[in-house]
Every structure is written in C-alpha cells, then in structure tokens.
C-alpha cells in the first residue's frame, strides 16, 4: 500500500544529502552560559536568555510559591474560567512598564503577532511590511487576508511611498516592523517609520521580541529607546527571551486590548498560562527595574565578543545588538561550522534558507549578561581555530 506521506521522508533525505538537515540538540541542564547538550558541556551562544533570568532566584521562588498556592494550571481558556488574578496582575505590570493603557498576554510571541495582525485587519485593508519581518508577522499578514505591500529592508522612503500610493484607497493601513531583526541583529528604523505612519494615517506596529529587556530604559524596548511613547499604536513583546520564561504580549490602548479579547483567535482558543509562568514573569519585570546592571553587562559582553569576532576576520554583517551572525554564505558551510564548533565546546546554531536568503547562511551567536570574559575568550579561540580550519575567515566588510 502506498504511503501518502512518503514524500516527507524523501525531502528529509534530500536535506541530509545537502548538509542542511538539523537534529534537535537536547538540553540536559539549566539554560545557562555554560550548559550540557547531548551529554557535552559547552559554552552556550545559542540561547535567547539575554539576562540570565531563566535561573534567577527570584523567578524560581515566584514560580514555586504560585504553584503551591494556585496549582499547576488554570484549567480553561481566558474567556471561560481561565483568567486568574495572576494573569490580570501580570498584564497590569507590563502595561505600567511599557507606559501604555493596557496589555494582553498570549501563549507565545508568535501567537501575539499572528493573532493580532489577523484580528485587527480585514481583506479590504492594507499592510506595509519590512521584507525581513519575523515569520509570525508574515503569517499574521497572510491570515488577515489583507493586501500585503513589502518594502526593502529598513527602507523608510520606500515604506512611505507605498503608504502614499494607498492614500485615498478604501481600507485601513498598517505599517509594521521588527524592533530588532532576529537574524541580522540590526535595529529597525522606527523614528522614520513612525513619521511615515503619522503622515499617511496608518496604524504603527512594532515587534519588540528581541529588544525587550535589551534596548531602552531598563529594557523597555525600541519605543523607549527612540523616545516614541504614545506614537506606536501596537507594541508586541515576548516573555520567552530576556524575560526568561514563556509567552508573548501586546500593549496599546484599552480599546485595542479589549478588541483582542474578543477577536484574537490564539487568545480565544488557548488555555491560559500556568500560575508559575505568570508569577515568574512578574518577578522578571521587578528584576529589570531593580537590577539594571544586568543590561549593562549584556552590552559590555556584546561589544567585547563582537569586536573579537571581527578582529579574527569573521563577517558579522550589520549587527547592532547582542544578536551577532557569523555570515558564511552557503547553508552546508554554516551547518559544518556549527557542528565543528560544538565538537570543540561551543554551541552556536547554523541557519540557512529559507530562514535567511540564499547565499546568506550564517551561524548566529547571542552572548548573555551571565557569560564571563573567560568564557567569551575561549569561545573566540574556538571560532578562530575552526574558522581557519574550514577556510571561512574573511576581511571585515566595509
């Protein structure tokens, strides 16, 4: 009998032949600067745990206390009986932190982006979107069935031209960008985009997943970083990266949040966060405000490691943040570099097409606030040794 799914196995074999097949690495310890993967202790440069909060004592204690008091789950979606006092307290905490009227928490950052874009727009509306926006934004745009207009990466003039072309046409306009782009580590041109949105009456939305806890005062994100409070209508963030736990959120006006309560499908049809998650997220925002030295250490480590990679002869692209790619070109080369690094005690993930464009494959590195200079020096030594052996060292780009 023919297997109707046989083509899946054929595709997997093709990826293996091309050297782009990826096996899941298994974490066998805490997610820390040095961690154990697949039975091997390595320097971890593949985690989004920017500030080391996954193991912070205050978050651990908050999770344990919430579990003791409320149990391990809510038992329902938010709109039936799954809204706990902890969920409301977390949303109010985030809203104060972000200086907005209200906030709603989603089960993931992906759900927050996709669910929000799909909820607030209709097929009669228009979306103007950066070509390198996150997959969750792209999927949300598709789900909305709105008309999608893509502009070249960070080209504010092109974005404004596209908005101008839509002036007078039926439907609403949404202008959307990442705050920090997850593959290249560059910062979105939010001031110019905000001006364009205001000029043409568009909704302005930013995905701050990789800038929450990284940019702005105490990690408030790109809106704070650029001083644009009150001028960005929809702010999306994550609780899974610098916050160190799980989930995503949307911030904005009270009307926006109440609308999402009624129309955002991931919110409507997913069980709410466990009490431990909500409580530990609240503790994380306290840490952001009370331990700003963590963010300073993150940036000190970022500058040190980025400078070391460039000095060794690696192409780190246009990175401006802790996300630092080592661009090598072909996907096979990126995966070979990642595998060789792991064998020598460094975990950094190889990334190729379709996550990044053809010919722009890279090994993505992220340093954290908890890496020591000794660990970073060891990682740089391994990168230089492996890069030389594989013949991928290049001159610094102009």
Functional labels for PLM-detected ranges:
Residues 149-206:
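Active-site phosphate-binding strand-loop segment of PLP-dependent enzymes
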Residues 116-135:
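Conserved PLP-anchoring active-site segment centered on the Schiff-base-forming lysine
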Residues 4-70, 202:
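N-terminal "arm"/small-domain region of PLP-dependent enzymes with the aminotransferase-like
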Residues 61-109:
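Conserved N-terminal alpha-helix of the aminotransferase class I/II PLP-enzyme fold
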